[in-house]
Each structure stands twice: as structure tokens, then as C-alpha cells.
Amino acid sequence: MLLWILLLETSLCFAAGNVTGDVCKEKICSCNEIEGDLHVDCEKKGFTSLQRFTAPTSQFYHLFLHGNSLTRLFPNEFANFYNAVSLHMENNGLHEIVPGAFLGLQLVKRLHINNNKIKSFRKQTFLGLDDLEYLQADFNLLRDIDPGAFQDLNKLEVLILNDNLISTLPANVFQYVPITHLDLRGNRLKTLPYEEVLEQIPGIAEILLEDNPWDCTCDLLSLKEWLENIPKNALIGRVVCEAPTRLQGKDLNETTEQDLCPLKNRVDSSLPAPPAQEETFAPGPLPTPFKTNGQEDHATPGSAPNGGTKIPGNWQIKIRPTAAIATGSARNKPLANSLPCPGGCSCDHIPGSGLKMNCNNRNVSSLADLKPKLSNVQELFLRDNKIHSIRKSHFVDYKNLILLDLGNNNIATVENNTFKNLLDLRWLYMDSNYLDTLSREKFAGLQNLEYLNVEYNAIQLILPGTFNAMPKLRILILNNNLLRSLPVDVFAGVSLSKLSLHNNYFMYLPVAGVLDQLTSIIQIDLHGNPWEYSCTIVPFKQWAERLGSEVLMSDLKCETPVNFFRKDFMLLSNDEICPQLYARISPTLTSHSKNSTGLAETGTHSNSYLDTSRVSISVLVPGLLLVFVTSAFTVVGMLVFILRNGKRSKRRDANSSASEINSLQTVCDSSYWRNGPYNADGAHRVYDCGSHSLSD
């Protein structure tokens, strides 16, 4: 019978996945009740799998697993955590969720998988989350969402997908999902259809659509009409046009149907027939741009009808050579002398300069395909094509370029020294691509570059010295990437005036060696980062306070810890952010100055983090310990010195006595004394050598 019991226990342990035990009972994790709810905190425990662990089975709990190494979730990963009511998995490097991973979590109402590396949501990704009401998946690498990804979430109300790489939402993605709050900020959406998408969320109460490259054309009419018919305060933030250029920076709600779709309903049978060929029109502005061959040139996202490129938001730069737009009949005339131009592109003369070559949206897959090569091109537009890589051989014939637009392609590879021949280039657009690393070698030769736009990429790493190759760089656009840190001296030797770092992954930014190098900054945008309010952010806060609101664009909201969530850190005092550093100091220790005492008691000194009159305990204690140890060694040294001197003194006395005895012995042994004892009369001393021992 005992053998059967042992075999049964062994088989049960094997079936349970070799569970080691309760994470609370074995104190693997911290388990505490907060306001009546059990919090199982397994933060930064190095977990790579959960199948060997279990949690309390007698009560419900909130499970915190952020900061581990759960990079992949396999089916039944949470089978032993069936009493969880919320699950936090931020910052795990999670990149794959196998369908069935959440089976057993039928009680979970809130799921946080933000700040990971998830690239797609497949069908049945969330299978098992029957009661899920809140899903947070911001700051990932989401590009693809299957139409059936959310079909199992029949109670989902809040969906947070901001700061990903989503360019489109599939049809019926929200079918049978009762969404009331939808956050799509900081993605790559150019349009949002009403049919089979927006029409499926009739109960929407809040929607956020900021920081997307909206293409304000006919396709956006349905979104505009839908926004006008939802509850008045449902739209949070702005929907700002990024293209076409004539509407760039304009709010969607300020546009008209005619603005978005100028050709709509323009054809009318009552209008007179077009004039004969010999008839002419008076010069005047046309509703839409035309190519040199007279065909309509439809505006594309991020591009201007005249080949221009968007400058996001308030980031204005000086007038570029493309600012002048030809009007009237002159715009429609072919180029003089039948100027050769690569197939599919349009070429224009720049007054008093070279050529402007517009190859936007021409299905170009390689710059090597652009033939014939024109050596006098000064502005080259290659936006909205299918270019995957660029090499230094591609620009050998374009040494006169001053503007290059490679935005909205599929560029993931930039060969070192690609731009080395472009010594006169001043504007470079490489936004909306797939770059992941920036290095000095990639930008070698751009000694006159003033404007660099690499927003909406997947940049995770900027190597030291990257921008040193561009000493004249003034405007740097790095927003909507995957940056978590910046190297020391990244801005050394560069006099930036405008810098955009919003919608990245920064938790804090160091002042020394990074921000303190921005001595010429007049505008910086840092919003949309998951700032962590801890002692490390205090110098950054003080730096931001010195800049002021006229330089620092938008508020900076805290992401962690929970008690500071979504708070503006400018409204918090330094001792709130770092209480251990700003511990109250006794007035007796600060009585040297009435003013400094007051500051120590209130903790409101504006720059107290750098104030030498207030010493951190972490500095004070080691200092006192050092003084104590030094004093102890000094006392011991003095004692040793005194003792050694005493011994030496005794030796000297002994040696002196011995010397005297030896001298006396010598005298007694002399022939003078041997002749007989010395006797003196009266008061004279009598010394008889024979009657005394010399050892006495």
C-alpha cells in the first residue's frame, strides 16, 4: 500500500509539471495584503517559465511578474495561477504568445503586457481570458493584428495600443467587442475606415488618435464624419493632418469636405465643354497639383504635391528651395529642351539652381533602377516606395544633392559611408522605415546636414559619436522609436536647436554627458515616455525646470511607481520623488544658517539635489565611518609609538649601567689598585675593590 501511495504522489508531481511549491509559502515572491487584496509580487525574480510554480488557491490575488525574462508564453503557462484577477507582465522582453498561453485565467479582468517586444496578435492569442475588461499593450512592436485576435474578449472595454507600429486595422477586428476606451496614439495610421472598423464600436466613450501620420484626403472623410457624431468629449487630443502639404499641421475638425476631397462632385454635366486647344486660361491657382506631363499627381502620405516633405507639428525650419510653387499654365508645360528624366519620375528646374526629381510613390525598389542618372539633381524625393536598402554606390552621381527624402519605405539596411559623397546635403528624411541602429559610419560625409528626421523607425541603439559626423545639425527628429537610453557625449560637438524624443521608452535621461550638452536648445519634446520617478530622475527634473515651459514642449507624466502614475513631475517636489535623499535634517545640525535650516525643514529648495548644505545620509554615514576609522588608527599608532619608545629607554638605561660596571671593573683590575687598597683620611671616601662585588 505504501508503494502505491508513493507511485501516485510521483505521478501527480510529474503531471503537475514538477511544481516546486507555492511562491508565497516558500517566500519566492513577496505576498502582502493591500487594502484587502492579496498582491503576489514576483518582480525581477529571473523567471523564464511559470509552469514549475503555483500560487495561493484559497483566495484571489493580483499577480505581478514585471521585470522577469518571460520571453515566450506557451500553452497552459498560467495553469497554476487560476485565482489571479489581474496580471502584470511589463518589461519581460516578451515577443511571442502562443495561442492557449492564457488558458486557466478565466478570472483575470486586467492584463498588462506593455513595454515588451510583441510583434503580432494572432487568432486565439487571448483564448481563456473570458472576463478580460482591460488590455494594455502599448510600447510594443505591434504591426500585425489578426481580424480574430480579440474575438474571445466579449467583455473587453479598454484597449490600449498606443506607441506601436500599427499602420492599419483589419476589417471586423472589433466585431462583438464592447470597446468603450481605445488608445491608438503614436502609431502609423494614415486612415481609419468606418465600415467594418469604426462602425463596430458604437459605445465608444474615449478615443485617442494623436501622433499618427494622418493622410487628410478623401479616405479620411468617414473618420471626420464619425468623430463629429460621437459624444462631444469622446475624442481626447487632436487629429492633425500630416499630408498633403497644403493641410499639414491642420486639425481634422477644422477641415471641410472640400479641403479633404477637392475633386469630389466637381464633375457636372451642366458645365460647358472644355475649351478648344487654342483657347487659354488666365493664370491662377489650381485645386490640385499636376505633373509636368499634365497628369494628376495624387498626394501621398508624408509628401507634398510639389515634392515637398512634411515637417511634423511645430517643427518649422527655414524655407527650403522647394517652397516656390509654379502656378497657372506654366506648371503644366513640359520641361524645356525635353529634359531626360528617369521613367515614372517627374523633373523640374529649380530657379537659379539645379533639378528637383520627384519619384514619390513609383514602386521604386532600388535606387539603381533610376536611369538615366542626372548629375545636377539638388532635390530627390523617393517617399512611399519599396526600397529595402541603400548603398554608397547609389549616390555616386548625386553629389549636388541638398535635400533627400527616403521616408515611408522599407529601409532596414544603410551601408556604411553611403552618404559620404553628399557633402552639400542639408535635409535628410528617413522617417517611417525599419532602422534599428544609428552609427557614425552610416552618416559619414554629412558635414553640412542641418535637418535629420528618423521618426517612426524601430531604433533601439544609438552608438557613441553618431552625430559627431554632422557638426552643423540643428534639428533632430527621433520620436516614435524604441530608445531606452542615450550614450554619453551623444550630442558632443553638435549645436542642436530642436530635438524630438517623444514616444520612446526613456525612464530617465542623464544630465551629465547627455542633456548638459544641449547648450543651444530652444525646443525639446519629451512627452510620451514611461518616466520613472525615483532619485535618478531628480537631476533631470531640475534640468527641465531650468529650461522652462517655453523650451520644454508638453507635460511629462510619470509611469512608475503606481502612486505617481500619470502625474506631472513638474508639480512634485524633489523630496516627494526621493524621500531618502531629502530626509528631514534636525535644526540643530543646520543652525549655521537660518535660511538653510528653513530649507531643510520644508524640503522645498529648488535645487536641493545639488545643494552642498544638505548632505545625504548615504554620504554622511560613510564619511563619519571614515573619520572614526582614521581616528582609531591614529590612537593605535600613538600607543605603539609610546610603547616602543619606552622599551628603547629601558635598553639605554641597561646599557649605561653595564658600561659603568665595565669601567669600574677595568679600574679595579688596573695595576694601580693591585698595589694595595686606597685609604684616605678624614672626609675622603675609601673604596676597597676586594670588599665589594662588581655585580651589586
Swiss-Prot record:
Modified residues (Phosphoserine): S695
GO cellular component terms, semicolon-separated: extracellular region; GABA-ergic synapse; glutamatergic synapse; postsynaptic density membrane; synapse
Primary residence: membrane
BP GO terms, sorted: axonogenesis; positive regulation of axonogenesis; positive regulation of synapse assembly
Oligomeric and partner information: Can form homodimers; homodimerization requires repeat LRR 2. Interacts with YWHAB, YWHAE, YWHAG, YWHAH, SFN, YWHAQ and YWHAZ.
Keywords for the protein's UniProt record, in alphabetical order: Glycoprotein, Leucine-rich repeat, Membrane, Phosphoprotein, Repeat, Secreted, Signal, Synapse, Transmembrane, Transmembrane helix
Superkingdom per UniProt: Eukaryota
Record PTM: Undergoes proteolytic cleavage that results in shedding of the ectodomain and cleavage of the C-terminal cytoplasmic tail. Glycosylated. Phosphorylation at Ser-695 is necessary for proper function in promoting neurite outgrowth.
Function: It is involved in synaptogenesis and promotes excitatory synapse differentiation. Enhances neuronal dendrite outgrowth.
Pfam family, any one: LRR_8
InterPro entries assigned to the protein according to its UniProt record, in alphabetical order: Cys-rich_flank_reg_C, Leu-rich_rpt, Leu-rich_rpt_typical-subtyp, LRR_dom_sf
Region annotated Disordered, chain positions: 265-313
Cleavable signal peptide: 1-17
Protein name as annotated: SLIT and NTRK-like protein 1
Boundaries of every LRRCT domain copy: 212-263, 529-580
Localization per record: Membrane; Secreted; Synapse
Family: Belongs to the SLITRK family.
Record flagged with keyword Membrane: yes
PANTHER family, per the entry: SLIT AND NTRK-LIKE PROTEIN 1, SLIT AND NTRK-LIKE PROTEIN 4-RELATED
UniProt topological domain (Extracellular) ranges: 18-622
